[in-house]
Amino acid sequence: MRVDLRPVTLDDISILRTWDSEPDRDEWAGTDGPWEWEAEIPIDEPWKTMWIAERGGLAIGFVQLLETSLDETNYWGEDAEKGTWAIDLWIGDPVHRGGGIGSQIMSRAIEILDECGASRVLVDPLIANRRAHAFYEACGFAPIGERSFGADRCLVFERRLDQ
């Protein structure tokens, strides 16, 4: 069954909070704590889009696309060059993980970024999240180095879209 992406709305806060409180959350999302969805969702900026992944009308995941050079938080620092975007991708309920849904979501996210003219895409899974490392490599990303983001130690991966 096909996975579709639709823009996040305030109506999604309940499911996002549920996913954000999963017992294994810190293993894949880091130690920064839950997102402030009420503040994040209404922000309408061309450099950041947030999507809900659905399969058969059921919300199963979340993806955020962020143009690093325009991100006001400067999260990506020196990696924030024009044309570089970052992806945050979650599969919410653990029952949906490991069945190819993430690959479908990533393919759709890459299509969107290609349409936006992105030349490079970054992801930042935690160092200990070996499952995510294998996933990103299978999706065409290559590791480019370790980096600390707040208290979290991550392995940054990139995928070039301009080659």
What positions do the PLM features span?
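Acetyl-CoA-dependent GNAT
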Residues: 31-96, 112, 160-163
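A short, well-structured alpha-helix characteristic of acyl/acetyltransferase catalytic modules
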Residues: 1-41, 60, 163
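Conserved acetyl-CoA-binding loop of GNAT-fold acetyltransferases
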Residues: 137-145
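Conserved GNAT acetyl-CoA-binding A-motif
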Residues: 113-125
